[in-house]
């Protein structure tokens, strides 16, 4: 009798977490997820100082391209990492000094990476100072007419 009592108590303890898990799983099945209809974007407060990116006029072209390759891969948000790293892998080797400087200004002159993403995807209008030949190339790259899967960064 005591043995049956102990087995039943231990059995209930072991079954309790499983019942809880199945109850939670069934609750999750009923949950619906929706994406917001519009982008919520607030202006930066005026009291936040944004540091100016230092201009490097004496930097050799190859060194600048290597730096831009690294900076395009390490943006801090996956969306831009994928878009910019694939863009650089495709176009950077063919850029001349002026185009390289434009790309440098684009990715380092903007204080918010979401701005680059919204401009490249045509979610927001591009400001005139950043609406350059390089931005137009980036927008074409983002449209992905070739239907290339961009689920990871290209190899170095």
UniProtKB/Swiss-Prot annotation:
Main localisation: mitochondrion
Protein name: Succinate dehydrogenase assembly factor 2-B, mitochondrial
Subunit structure, as described in the record: Interacts with the flavoprotein subunit within the SDH catalytic dimer.
Organism of origin: Drosophila sechellia
Residue stretch of the organelle transit peptide: 1-24
Alphabetized UniProt keyword annotations: Chaperone, Mitochondrion, Transit peptide
Coiled-coil residue windows: none
Organism classification: Eukaryota, Metazoa, Ecdysozoa, Arthropoda, Hexapoda
UniProt family annotation: Belongs to the SDHAF2 family.
Function, in words: Plays an essential role in the assembly of succinate dehydrogenase (SDH), an enzyme complex (also referred to as respiratory complex II) that is a component of both the tricarboxylic acid (TCA) cycle and the mitochondrial electron transport chain, and which couples the oxidation of succinate to fumarate with the reduction of ubiquinone (coenzyme Q) to ubiquinol. Required for flavinylation (covalent attachment of FAD) of the flavoprotein subunit of the SDH catalytic dimer.
GO biological process: mitochondrial electron transport, succinate to ubiquinone; mitochondrial respiratory chain complex II assembly; protein-FAD linkage; tricarboxylic acid cycle
GO cellular component, one term: mitochondrial matrix
Compartment(s) of residence: Mitochondrion matrix
UniProt-listed Pfam families: Sdh5 (PF03937)
